[in-house]
């Protein structure tokens, strides 16, 4: 091989490398990003230090687990479950979620609620509330969501900070990849 042929191969390799790096950066910035769970507000579904992929282009729906900018400090991020979408009325009464007046199952909490009720027959895993009591409005406004942590007794969520703006949702967290024993697609969506 002559020097020209080697230089051509090196240049081709560098071009491919630059394209690959640019593609990875674009994917991370616009499509998917890794996220580490920091804290216990989603215990029972997600664990502290668990690693997830966050899909930035996902259409957010009720019960999705999402990464949001913290209302009090946008440089921080929280992970919560979307409970209310625009137009919803929400109430929790005697550990039952009522969406638009209809009792709605929360399978992601069922086991923990049973355990809690067995140990605390006169207590509620989730304290009773209405949307009006905690957020100051009876329905979720357009362009907003109402979010809760799955660890209802230890979560800074919509009961404290009210509605979140839809534009503060960074993406849906739906694929757990670390630790490997928790590797699963869609588990957070249960």
Predicted feature residues:
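Hydrophobic membrane-insertion alpha-helices, especially the h-region
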Residues: 12-30
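Soluble "head" domains of membrane/secretory-pathway proteins
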Residues: 2-10, 30, 48-187
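Aromatic-capped interface at the extracytoplasmic side
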Residues: 24-42
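Membrane-proximal juxtamembrane linkers immediately C-terminal to transmembrane helices
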Residues: 43-47
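Hydrophobic, membrane-facing alpha-helical anchors
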Residues: 10-11, 36
């Amino acid at each position: 091989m002559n020097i020209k042929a080697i230089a051509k191969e090196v240049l081709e390799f560098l071009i491919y490398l630059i394209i690959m790096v640019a593609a990875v950066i674009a994917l991370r910035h616009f499509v998917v990003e890794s996220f580490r769970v920091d804290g216990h507000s989603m215990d029972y579904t997600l664990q502290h230090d668990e690693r997830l992929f966050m899909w930035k282009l996902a259409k957010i729906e009720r019960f999705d687990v999402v990464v949001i900018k913290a209302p009090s400090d946008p440089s921080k991020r929280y992970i919560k479950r979307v409970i209310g979408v625009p137009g919803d009325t929400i109430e929790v009464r005697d550990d039952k979620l009522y969406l638009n007046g209809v009792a709605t199952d929360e399978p992601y909490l069922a086991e923990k609620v049973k355990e809690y009720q067995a140990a605390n027959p006169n207590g509620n895993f989730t304290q009773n509330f209405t949307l009006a009591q905690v957020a100051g409005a009876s329905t979720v406004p357009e362009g907003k969501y109402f979010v809760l942590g799955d660890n209802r007794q230890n979560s800074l969520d919509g009961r404290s900070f009210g509605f979140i703006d839809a534009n503060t949702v960074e993406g849906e967290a739906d694929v757990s990849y670390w630790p490997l024993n928790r590797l699963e697609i869609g588990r957070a969506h249960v």
